[in-house]
Amino acid sequence: TLFPYTTLFRSPAGNNKIWNALRLVKGWTVADLPQPESAGIAVKWFEARVAAAIEELNDDFSKYRISEALMVVYKLFRDEFSSWYLEMVKPAYGQPIDATSYAATLRFFEQLTLLLHPFMPFITEEVWQALVERRPSKSIMITQMPDVGNKHDRLVADFENVKNIVAAVRSIRLERNIPNREPLTLQIVSGDYDDAYNTVITKMCHLEQIVRAPKDETSASFLVGTTEYAVPLGSTIDVAGEVKKMQEEIDYLEGFLASVMKKLGNEKFVAHAKPEVVANERKKQADAESKLKTLRENVEKLKGRDADVR
């Protein structure tokens, strides 16, 4: 198929995703309130994310890579805007949204309709017209496409870590049937952590607090990069399940490390590859070894705890 993602956007589900996002945003009550810190961070992140996507789109269009361009804008709307950004700025149930975040959200939505327009001309015209009041002579067809704007590669990269942390905490809730109304504590056990994103993580994970602390035996732990995190669970932890999950990750990392070591053990590769490529492989080796060390220690601790209980 030439345009594999076209059917996704033309399907009822694809159209519904856009209409549902519009209904959500237009259904908010707007008030003159201070912008929450988490929403301010979300706006800066999505601005940087849109800039990176537009740069990628421009490159794809210049090289006639239409399928790739469609994939970029599809993922930007579905994964980043609908699944992450809107949830980060969404006000609490029954509460208004601050005017600053709302204006930014309308601006982003308008940019997205412009980027989608070449692939979905009719629905994007309707949505674009519905976002704000416009003169009858205005049309998305004669509106200039958005420029790249302010790029911030570091912020975009940092947010991948944020999303991985949020996804891990949500998985812990799901696996143990812990309702969202029950606040959790997130512990930073070891490694680097930037507390600039605390408010976003706290909101998205429904946390009571984020602290630097050693994990106890009742904690469910996970790794993002080489940083270890833990969520204390009291007596609800399933030791056998945790050990099994960690062992599966150990097995995967051992295989991954073996493939990296094989590559680094190839003298021709080390001699002829670019220095930055070799350095990247060595970083993969170091990261995998660090993760394996942490996981093996955690498995032993959990097995020891289980033996003590018995």
Where are these regions (language model features)?
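Short, small-residue-biased leader/transition segments that mark boundaries at the very start
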Residues: T1-L8
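Feature 926 captures the class I aminoacyl-tRNA synthetase adenylation module centered on the KMSKS loop
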Residues: F9-R310
